[in-house]
Amino acid sequence: MKTTTYSLLALAAASKLASAHTTVQAVWINGEDQGLGNSADGYIRSPPSNSPVTDVTSTDMTCNVNGDQAASKTLSVKAGDVVTFEWHHSDRSDSDDIIASSHKGPVQVYMAPTAKGSNGNNWVKIAEDGYHKSSDEWATDILIANKGKHNITVPDVPAGNYLFRPEIIALHEGNREGGAQFYMECVQFKVTSDGSSELPSGVSIPGVYTATDPGILFDIYNSFDSYPIPGPDVWDGSSSGSSSGSSSAAAAATTSAAVAATTPATQAAVEVSSSAAAVVESTSSAAAATTEAAAPVVSSAAPVQQATSAVTSQAQAPTTFATSSKSSKTACKNKTKSKSKVAASSTEAVVAPAPTSSVVPAVSASASASAGGVAKMYERCGGINHTGPTTCESGSVCKKWNPYYYQCVASQ
């Protein structure tokens, strides 16, 4: 990875601002869309806005703001089911930019029994993906290329109610303490099969991270060869896991079998649009605290296998994390500071969407504003250089996050 590449791209993007935040908005089970999950009658414990959590000691780290409030519905799954999480910046439209391409970082998934997890306890990591040196890609690049979707496989756990917690850590301001941005939601599931793989004791959230952990206080703008994914190891009893190359073949077989049972065909050697270059912000202390930058991502194509779902045109096939091979390690114990866990593989099992474009467009703040002079929920409504609407739609107010970025959020 070249520092000069990032520097040149940073200069090109310095004047571009984009609302870059994201939330989980829907879930798929074995390729079947479960509908919008972040609504009043949904199944996702959703926050009032798509803004990140930055204080790793906050109770909002558990399930985000309002995460202690149960959702109306609970989805039913069984061991071996493939669950797909679908992230979006604004809405589920095909034009949605998912998250700003400048927001590089890992994607992880935790699970916990509902009662314990709601209190921040017994969280077990079942999947993770980080940085791939061979392709110079982050998990977030792959997520964007796959239209916000990534998979896990439900472990063979005892029947009961569980929370699944997908998480993104955006490191575009990770070069300063407190700059990393955490995005997460808790999705409510009922496991109907009665497996024998008891979850380990897990970790506490908050508590699992500190602001100075190597993978949280991390400068993506300087040269590096590896990235230590924060948090515990992936539980060796999970069916999802990390993207380590040593186990990608096993994951591919597991995922293919699970998806083939519910989808009619397999499309081989598809090309996935994936980011090969990052667009970053100025790394001065002032700009790092206030500026969010995004620009078009140059993509590179790689042949992978895709399990094609027979649902809707929106059912792009998501990233699948490979099965972890770290069975000799104690599950879900915090790693030491010196430990470097590298997610780098050219043989990663990725379930990817059919190619639609070689470029993933980033939406500028002004371009994303709604027509008619009124900004929609979560859109930009003010700040330095803003030329779009400054009035928010009914039910939302314009909140100042920093001098550069004001956003429409739900009225309190």
Swiss-Prot record:
First and last residue of the signal peptide: 1-20
GO biological process: cellulose catabolic process
Kinase listed as a keyword: no
Any one GO cellular component localisation term in the record: extracellular region
Disulfide bonds: 63-186
Every CBM1 domain range: 373-409
Required cofactor(s): Cu(2+)
Major site of localization recorded for this protein: secreted
Root EC class: oxidoreductase
InterPro entries assigned to the protein according to its UniProt record, in alphabetical order: AA9 (IPR049892), AA9_LPMO (IPR005103), CBD_sf (IPR035971), Cellulose-bd_dom_fun (IPR000254)
Reactions it catalyzes: [(1->4)-beta-D-glucosyl]n+m + reduced acceptor + O2 = 4-dehydro-beta-D-glucosyl-[(1->4)-beta-D-glucosyl]n-1 + [(1->4)-beta-D-glucosyl]m + acceptor + H2O
Binding-site residues, O2: 172
UniProt keyword list: Carbohydrate metabolism, Cellulose degradation, Copper, Disulfide bond, Glycoprotein, Metal-binding, Monooxygenase, Oxidoreductase, Polysaccharide degradation, Secreted, Signal
Industrial and biotechnological uses noted in the record: Lignocellulose is the most abundant polymeric composite on Earth and is a recalcitrant but promising renewable substrate for industrial biotechnology applications. Together with cellobiose dehydrogenases (CDHs) an enzymatic system capable of oxidative cellulose cleavage is formed, which increases the efficiency of cellulases and put LPMOs at focus of biofuel research.
Location relative to the cell: Secreted
Record EC number: 1.14.99.56
Domain comment (free text): Has a modular structure: an endo-beta-1,4-glucanase catalytic module at the N-terminus, a linker rich in serines and threonines, and a C-terminal carbohydrate-binding module (CBM). The CBM domain is essential for binding to and subsequent oxidative degradation of polysaccharide substrate.
Protein task: Lytic polysaccharide monooxygenase (LPMO) that depolymerizes crystalline and amorphous polysaccharides via the oxidation of scissile alpha- or beta-(1-4)-glycosidic bonds, yielding C4 oxidation products. Catalysis by LPMOs requires the reduction of the active-site copper from Cu(II) to Cu(I) by a reducing agent and H(2)O(2) or O(2) as a cosubstrate.
Family in the record: Belongs to the polysaccharide monooxygenase AA9 family.
Descriptive protein name: AA9 family lytic polysaccharide monooxygenase A
Organism name: Aspergillus niger (strain ATCC MYA-4892 / CBS 513.88 / FGSC A1513)
Lineage: Eukaryota, Fungi, Dikarya, Ascomycota, Pezizomycotina
